[in-house]
Design a protein with these regions (language model features):
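A short, charged, amphipathic alpha-helix used as a generic interaction element across diverse proteins
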Residues: 29-47
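Generic N-terminal initiation segments characterized by hydrophobic and/or small/turn-forming residues
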Residues: 2-3, 35-36, 40, 62
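Short, mixed-charge low-complexity intrinsically disordered segments
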Residues: 41-74
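Surface-exposed beta-strand edges and their flanking turn/coil or helix-capping segments
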Residues: 18-20, 36-39, 71-73
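N-terminal acidic leader/helix
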Residues: 2-32
Length: 74
């Protein structure tokens, strides 16, 4: 399935509330596996939420660095 993916990497610095944002259009049948593959080799804790419209939000704690992956059906 084709998705629009918005990846947000939250800044740990308390004085800087900006975050890095990346947009791509992956083709995957399993968004969680796609994220795990992207973060392979790192210590990762993942929480996943699936919405009725097909949107999948995956919050990942990557060794203390928070990232959010929002997959929206394309």
């Amino acid at each position: 399935m084709k998705y629009e993916l918005i990846r947000e990497i939250y800044n740990k610095c308390s004085g800087n509330q900006m975050r890095d944002v990346f947009i791509s259009n992956p083709d995957t049948d399993d968004p969680e596996e796609y994220v795990r593959d992207m973060l392979k080799g790192k210590l990762v804790k993942i929480e996943k939420e699936v919405f009725p419209d097909g949107t999948v939000i995956i919050d990942a704690d990557v060794a203390g660095l928070q990232q959010r992956f929002t997959f929206s059906p394309d």
